[in-house]
From Swiss-Prot:
Species the sequence originates in: Chromobacterium violaceum (strain ATCC 12472 / DSM 30191 / JCM 1249 / CCUG 213 / NBRC 12614 / NCIMB 9131 / NCTC 9757 / MK)
Gene Ontology annotations for the cellular component aspect, listed alphabetically: ribonucleoprotein complex; ribosome
Any one of the GO BP annotations: translation
InterPro entries: Ribosomal_uS11, Ribosomal_uS11_bac-type, Ribosomal_uS11_CS, Ribosomal_uS11_sf
Full protein name: Small ribosomal subunit protein uS11
Keyword RNA-binding attributed: yes
Length: 131
C-alpha cells in the first residue's frame, strides 16, 4: 500500500514592520480601552482593563489602565513601533496613567491630543445622582 504524502507546508504569518503608530485611549468611567494602530488606522494591538484581569470597580482604576497599556505596548513593540501619537478620549481615571505606562516602555511620544467629543448643546444629559 502506498504511503500518503503527509508533508504540509506551514506558512508563518509575516508581521509588517511599522515604525510609528497612533494610540487611541478610550477612558470611560467604567473601563479603559487602548488601541494601537498604524497611520492608516489598521489595528496592531489592543487591550482593555477588563481583559487585563480586572473586574468590577477595579477596571476603572488608573492602575488597571496602566496594565492594559503595557499589554498593548508590548504587542506593538513586536511590530517595530517606536514613535507614538496619543489620542485620548473620555473623562475616565485612566487617561494619564496609560500614557505614562507607554512612555516607560520606551516609546517616543510625539504628540498628545484630547479628542473627547464635546456636544454643541446636543442631547440632554442624564439626571444628577442622588445618593
Amino acid at each position: 500500500m502506498a504511503k500518503a504524502n503527509t508533508a504540509v507546508r506551514v506558512r508563518k504569518k509575516v508581521r509588517k514592520s511599522v515604525s510609528e503608530g497612533i494610540v487611541h485611549v478610550h477612558a470611560s468611567f467604567n473601563n479603559t480601552i487602548i488601541t494601537i494602530t498604524d497611520r492608516q488606522g489598521n489595528a496592531l494591538s489592543w487591550a482593555t482593563s477588563g481583559g487585563a484581569g480586572f473586574k468590577g470597580s477595579r477596571k476603572s482604576t488608573p492602575f488597571a489602565a496602566q496594565v492594559a497599556a503595557e499589554h498593548a505596548g508590548k504587542v506593538a513593540q513586536e511590530y517595530g513601533v517606536k514613535n507614538l501619537e496619543v489620542r485620548i478620549k473620555g473623562p475616565g481615571p485612566g487617561r494619564e496613567s496609560a500614557v505614562r505606562a507607554l512612555n516607560s516602555l520606551g516609546f517616543k511620544i510625539t504628540s498628545i491630543s484630547d479628542v473627547t467629543p464635546v456636544p454643541h448643546n446636543g442631547c440632554r444629559p442624564p439626571k444628577k445622582r442622588r445618593i
